Structure formats: C-alpha cells, structure tokens
C-alpha cells in the first residue's frame, strides 16, 4: 500500500506567496552555512524555523543552490509535490 501525501490546504498559515520565487527550483540538502559571513542564522521560508550552527537550532535542511533560502525537512515534505522541487545530490 503506497502512502499518499496530502498537499497542505490553500489556507495553510505557512503559505505566504513562496510560489512566486520557489516553484520548480533546484534544492540541495546540506549542512547549514550562513549566506553572508555577518549572518549567524536563517529561517525556513515556510514555517520560520531557525537554521544556525548552534545547538538546539536546525543544522541542516534544503536550500536553494546559492544557499540564500532555506526550507526545513517538514515543510519540504509538505510542499515538495506542489512546488515541483528538484533535489540535487
């Protein structure tokens, strides 16, 4: 029996227009690294979870190829079908 994944409803609180800039993009699963040296953290583009190199924060997840935008694993799994993401190994 295959597991069917449900796409989050249109009124899901995490939806904030991300389809304008994240639909169909290539993502890379990797350890968190700040986009700029003066930055110490980033947030999930959907739920706002904190990514950093500090204990207690998310230390890995999916990012755009340039490392600018980050998506936590939970939100990635919830939105991957709808957003048609391609994951680079």
List each model region and its residues.
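N-terminal alpha-helical interaction blocks
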Residues: 1-34
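Intrinsically disordered, low-complexity regions enriched in Ser/Pro/Gly/Gln/His and often acidic
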Residues: 5-6, 32, 63-64, 76-78
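Short, flexible, mixed-charge glycine/proline-rich loop motifs
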Residues: 25-43, 62-66
């Amino acid at each position: 029996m295959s597991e069917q994944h449900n796409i989050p409803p249109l009124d899901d609180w995490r939806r904030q227009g991300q389809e304008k800039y994240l639909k169909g993009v290539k993502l890379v699963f990797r350890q968190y690294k700040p986009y700029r040296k003066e930055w110490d953290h980033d947030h999930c583009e959907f739920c706002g979870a904190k990514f950093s190199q500090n204990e207690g924060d998310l230390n890995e997840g999916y990012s755009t190829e340039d490392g600018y935008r980050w998506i936590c694993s939970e939100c990635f799994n919830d939105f991957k079908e709808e957003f048609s993401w391609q994951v680079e190994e």
